[in-house]
Curated annotation (Swiss-Prot):
One of its GO terms (molecular function) is metal ion binding. It catalyses: RNA(n) + a ribonucleoside 5'-triphosphate = RNA(n+1) + diphosphate. This is DNA-directed RNA polymerase subunit beta'. Binds 1 Mg(2+) ion per subunit. Binds 1 Zn(2+) ion per subunit. It comes from Weissella hellenica. Pfam families: RNA_pol_Rpb1_1, RNA_pol_Rpb1_2, RNA_pol_Rpb1_3, RNA_pol_Rpb1_4, RNA_pol_Rpb1_5. HAMAP family: RNApol_bact_RpoC. SMART domains: RPOLA_N. It comes from the Bacteria. GO terms for biological process: DNA-templated transcription. Its cofactor is Mg(2+); Zn(2+). The gene is rpoC. DNA-dependent RNA polymerase catalyzes the transcription of DNA into RNA using the four ribonucleoside triphosphates as substrates.
Length: 1046
């Protein structure tokens, strides 16, 4: 290799050495005239402008040769940095000669920058800050900030103007020869070429002593070429290539999603990974996945080669490689052993929360599709209609241990967002267990009494009884560990054949489940046992049928089992529940036929009645009794009521064994609205602009739609599709911003010692409970002890964790407000403490120090974002203002924007004396008489008032319906009230859409929103007025000054 060292090819002048140098060696262009760096001149705020105290516009005129700037005023009446036009410059030159100096372009700016005395500027600015106010003060703070940064870093301001431009190595701006002798090249080469050409031309012009105006023009063009190279399009029109496409400059190579950082450094492709279509693997255990053999051979290739050599099945690595390529028998045997105990990671994009990547143990399967356990589909939000997933192999022992201990799918049973099971049976598994636990009166063999489960099984197999038959069984024959009382054990228990089989899959000492109630999860009621000598058939004749176990109840069972037995037993139960569900749903033969969609006799009558009501409303409008918007509102309400009536009647007419009804009732698939559209009426549709159309679709899918109805229907359907696509992108972007804000919030210590807390009560919307007190206090630490109001018994002590049992007792005692430790009142710097956070929702245990709760919070809020609606409700202007809901409302809150449909907040406590309407400018004026002063507020005429004349109102309350602005709340009240408001508002949006999120996640985000303070008066600290800083730094600065005696 050394043989050719230093030799240069005499044909093309290239050194003979390794090709790697094409990625390392840089060149440079020595410029014939300095050029300003566009980042420092055009950035916001303009760094050059701040250092020189010139406006960016003036700077631009100088740099691009439109004006002269005075660099040395000498003994003239001019001042430094004064701008002169061409004409003024000539006149002054004629008048003063060489007594002053002025220049143009980056050269002049470079001179000005080198004249700046940084130390002196710092002293002057600090003096200015003591007296300046308003905008002057803001400007001074900004200048001081940047000049101090220059002083601290040791950089010189004149370095913002370049004399030399570096050229990046050739391999980073490649040039490729295409067929036909043409070349494809990186845009950077074009941009560099422009700079070189203009620089060479300028050099030549300078050597020829060309006229000043030509040189100036060439310098300006060089400046523009350098600008385009660094950041094309930042100033003026971008330089374009063929087909009018803007060229990609150095800045574009770095920034954005496709830039160097996000695309290539954070988003590298990794080896030992693959992707394939996924298919369902009902035969798998909870922590397994099916890996196709060809994929396994490729992913585990080095491991297989090592093992082949180790077992002497191949002489060396090369021979082992050949064996693998030939698919030898030996290789298959070795593969089985290699993948044993070696977990792999499965990921499905988009990875919205941490359950989007989980670890599994691979099991070899035939075919080319990876097999996924049906219960983890919900966490991945995967289905099997062609979804693909990526697989990664952890290589090092540490990575494998981490995958096994922390990421194995069997351990992720609860969702981090709300602590409810995310691994729960769905679809076939639900319908199977629903069918199994259904009871029917009068089925064959009803009232038979059996000795034990085996006898029941034999009777069922020989068709003496049906799964739905209600029977009796000797309780003593059931597992001795079941928590029956001694009296219950001595009696006969009433249950159904299916429920007996279902209870077989539960842990041995779990209560026998006979009815889907919360109480039955803890103990079985005495009413299911026969009195000695009682006739079972007579008892059954008067006993109503118990409902079957639906999806929600199966989830409750899992949650209860997880609480008592933790991970291992729960994952075993889940597998048993899955197998039983698949078996029984297959045996049940449930299906959907056109006969299941029954006609509704009362429909024509309901529709006719609605038409009459609409005609009446239209008549009232024509007579001028109501406005157009009122007419529209009423018509919409009439048709909605008609649809609701039809739905109600359909439910009444349902046969309990109707297959579609069973699917919807069990929670397996579909809901009552789907059924209404099949058998009732399609209802109102949204127009493309989001407004609801007055003409409903009266037909249902069974009858078939008319052409016009079909046209309306496609309108609504298309809007739904576009909304979903937009929502996904919006929600993903919101998650990214939330993570960005909260990623450094980590549990730092056990107890911060905070003596403050947050008073919580149920979140209400009118009379509707949005989030109960039980949910809000569960898994939190109490800040103050809670006592039973009647007896005075202590329910929970100070700094004690509120468990399910304690929370239940608090609710039963009738307590409505509890003071809890909260992230809002936590004193921990750069994070939260264990006590202020409480329970980790994903494990059900107290959170551990080091847990990244900020990221979990951001993911928990962002992940359900796709389920929120996109629309701002267009009410047709009836309620005055359109209210923002769904995802846009959540973004509005977290970005602290001025809300749409703003509610006015009163700044005084007092009485509403008058509400006057001004029809001329369509406003209302509300006057409030406080104790010391009177305030008048102007509201739009269409506002819905929350107060009337004579009402007493407190400071910080709203006068009209709508969303309060958090920025106003913080001014009128305090930070705690603002943080509380953010939690309430975000919860309202999510809960209205049926999405449950734990308060603590929103608290973490709200705390981050209010972390920064702006220094108004620095006092005796070293802080600069107007600077934004972290509240912890602010406290430290104050404490430090106090300790020094300030």
């Amino acid at each position: 290799r050394i043989r050719y060292k230093g030799i240069v090819c005499d044909r093309c002048g290239v050194e003979v050495t390794s090709a790697k140098v094409r990625r390392e060696r840089m060149g440079h262009i020595e410029l014939a005239a300095p050029v300003s760096h566009i980042w420092y001149f055009k950035g916001i705020p303009s760094r050059m402008g701040l250092v020189l105290d010139m406006s960016p516009r003036s700077l631009e005129e100088v740099i691009y040769f439109a004006s002269y700037v005075v660099t040395k005023p000498g003994d003239t009446s001019l001042t430094e940095k004064q701008l002169l036009s061409e004409r003024e410059y000539r006149q002054l030159k004629a008048e003063y000669g060489n007594a002053f100096e002025a220049g143009m372009g980056a050269e002049a700016v470079q001179t000005l920058l080198s004249n700046v005395d940084l130390e002196e500027e710092v002293t002057e600015l600090k003096a200015q800050l003591r007296e300046a106010t308003g905008q002057k003060r803001v400007r001074a703070v900004r200048r001081l900030d940047i000049i101090e940064a220059f002083v601290k870093s040791g950089n010189k301001p004149e370095w913002m103007v370049m004399d030399v431009i570096p050229i990046i190595p050739p391999d980073l701006r490649p040039m490729v020869q295409l067929e036909g002798g043409r070349f494809a090249t990186s845009d950077l080469n074009d941009l560099y070429r422009r700079v070189i050409n203009r620089n060479n031309r300028l050099k030549r012009l300078l050597e020829l002593n060309a006229p000043g105006i030509i040189v100036q023009n060439e310098k300006r063009m060089l400046q523009e070429a350098a600008d385009a190279l660094v950041d094309n399009g930042r100033r003026g029109r971008p330089v374009t290539g063929p087909g009018n496409r803007p060229l990609k400059s150095l800045s574009h190579m770095l920034k954005g999603k496709q830039g160097r950082f996000r695309q290539d450094l954070l988003g590298k492709r990794v080896d030992y990974s693959g992707r394939s279509v996924i298919d369902v693997g009902p035969f798998l255990k909870m922590n397994q996945m099916g890996l196709p053999r060809p994929m396994a051979m490729e992913l585990f290739r080095p491991f297989i080669m090592k093992e082949l050599v180790k077992r002497d099945l191949a002489g060396n690595i090369r021979a082992a490689k050949r064996k693998i390529d030939r698919h030898d028998e030996d290789v298959m045997d070795v593969l089985e052993d290699v993948i044993k105990e070696h977990p792999v990671l499965l990921n499905r994009a988009p990875t919205l929360h941490r359950l989007g990547i989980q670890a599994f143990e691979p099991v070899l399967v035939s075919g080319k599709a990876m097999r996924l356990h049906p219960l983890v589909t919900e966490a991945y939000n995967a289905d099997f209609d062609g979804d693909q997933m990526a697989i990664h192999v952890p290589l090092s022992d540490e990575a494998q241990a981490e995958a096994r201990l922390l990421m194995l799918a069997a351990g992720h049973i609860l969702a981090p967002k709300d602590g409810k099971p995310i691994v729960a049976p769905s679809q076939d598994m639900v319908i199977g267990n629903y069918y199994l636990t259904t009871e029917e009166a009068g089925r064959e063999g009803e009232g038979m009494i059996f000795k034990d489960v085996n006898e029941v099984r034999t009777a069922y197999q020989n068709k003496y009884v049906h799964l739905h038959t209600r029977i009796g069984i000797q309780t003593a024959s059931l597992s001795a560990e079941k928590p029956f009382t001694a009296e219950q054990r001595s009696r006969i228990m009433m249950t159904s054949v299916g429920k007996l089989f279902f209870n077989d899959i539960l842990p041995a000492d779990f209560p026998y489940l006979n009815e889907p109630t919360e109480a039955n999860l803890h103990e079985i009621d005495n009413r299911f046992f026969l009195e000695p000598g009682e006739d079972i058939k007579a008892r059954y004749a008067e006993t109503p049928i118990l409902p079957p176990f639906k999806k929600g109840y199966l989830s409750d069972i899992i949650a209860e089992v997880y609480k008592i037995y933790k991970v291992t037993e729960t994952s075993l139960l889940l597998d048993r529940m899955k197998d039983l569900g698949y078996d029984e749903s297959t045996k049940s033969g449930l299906t959907v036929g056109v006969a299941d969609v029954t006609d509704l006799k009362e429909k024509p009558e309901i529709i006719e009645d609605a038409h009459k009501q609409v005609a009446t409303v239209t008549k009232q409008f024509r007579r001028g009794l109501i406005t157009d918007s009122e007419r529209y509102e009423r018509v919409i309400a009439i048709w909605n009521k008609a649809k609701d009536d039809i739905t109600e009647k359909l439910i009444e007419h349902f046969e309990p064994d109707n297959n579609i009804f069973m699917m919807s009732d069990s929670g397996a698939r579909g809901n009552i609205s789907n059924f209404t559209q099949l058998a009732g009426m399609r209802g109102l549709m949204a127009a493309p602009n989001g407004r609801i159309m007055e003409l409903p679709i009266i037909a249902n899918f069974r009858e078939g739609l008319s052409v016009l109805e079909m046209f309306f229907s496609t309108h609504g359907a298309r809007k739904g599709m576009t909304d979903t696509a937009l929502k996904t992108a919006d929600s993903g972007y919101m998650t990214r911003r939330l993570v960005d804000v909260a990623q450094d919030v980590i549990i730092r210590e056990d107890d911060c010692g905070s003596d403050r807390g947050l008073d919580v009560s149920a979140i209400m919307n009118g009379n509707e409970v949005i989030e109960s007190l039980y949910e809000r206090i569960l898994g939190r630490y109490a800040q103050k002890s809670v006592f039973e109001p009647q007896t005075g018994d202590k329910l929970v002590g100070h700094n004690e964790m509120i468990t399910e049992d304690i929370a239940k007792r608090i609710i039963e005692a009738g307590v409505t407000t509890v003071t809890i430790r909260s992230a809002f009142t936590c004193n921990t710097e750069h994070g939260v403490c264990v006590r202020c956070y409480g329970r980790n929702m994903a494990t059900g245990d107290v959170v551990e120090v080091g847990e990244a709760v900020g990221t979990v919070a951001a993911q928990s809020i962002g992940e359900p974002g796709t389920q929120l609606t996109m629309r701002t409700f267009h009410t047709g202007g009836v309620a005055g203002n359109d209210i923002t809901q769904g995802l846009p409302r959540v973004q509005e809150i977290f970005e602290a924007r001025n809300p749409k449909g703003r509610a006015m907040i009163t700044e005084v406590t007092g009485e509403v004396t008058t509400i006057e309407e001004n029809p001329a400018d369509r406003t209302k004026e509300v006057t409030i008489q406080g104790e010391t002063d009177t305030r008048t507020y102007t509201l739009p005429m269409s506002s819905r008032m929350r107060v009337g004349e004579g009402d007493h109102i407190h400071r910080g309350e709203t006068l009209n319906e709508g969303s309060a602005d958090p920025k106003e709340i913080i001014q009128v009240r305090d930070t705690l009230a603002t943080e509380n408001y953010i939690v309430l508002e975000v919860q309202k949006v999510y809960r209205m859409q049926g999405v449950e999120i734990s308060d603590k996640h929103i608290e973490v985000m709200a705390r981050q929103m209010l972390r920064k303070v702006r220094v108004m008066d620095p006092g005796e600290t070293d802080l600069l007025p107007g600077t934004l800083m972290d509240i912890a730094q602010f406290r430290d600065a104050n404490e430090g000054t106090l300790l020094k005696g300030g």
